[in-house]
Amino acid sequence: VYFFESTTAAWRDLGKWMRSQGVLVYYEIQRMYQKEFPKYLKCMKESDIVKFSDEAVEDLSFVDELKEKLVIQTLGAKGVRFNLRGGGWVTLPPVQNDNVVDTEGCGDWTTASFINALGKRGAVKFSDLTSEIVSECLMEAQEYASRNASYFGTKGIITANM
């Protein structure tokens, strides 16, 4: 898996090349600025998976242009949803946590855990992705993100388990 989160042409071009080599390319939008939308769209088009939070991206009209992608939108305490190959949004419930201390880093835990879960299932190419696999992997990823929210900082789980 090749992961990138910058709109810089060099990272996007590397993603394009990696994708041409059969590598699963994952692009994460940290914050979308409308005036730079063309840069974001180029990055999305060179990726297999596009992830963002509901806080980072408000206007989802571009999703219709991503029919051959997996689009993931995290919804905070409301869970997560995804759109695989333009098949419509599938919403997954949140993993409950009654001891939320800090949500910093939960998006990173979602991403890392999702990629790890895909690998554990042997889903290393875009053609391997099904709604069932994506749902299972996102639920597993939410478990880690939810657990991380019980601790302070982006590496809460790591420091708590030392």
Description of each model-found segment:
Residues 1-93, 122-128, 132-133, 152-161:
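Ribokinase/PfkB-type carbohydrate-kinase core domain
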Residues 96-162:
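Conserved post-catalytic alpha-helical subdomain immediately downstream of the catalytic base
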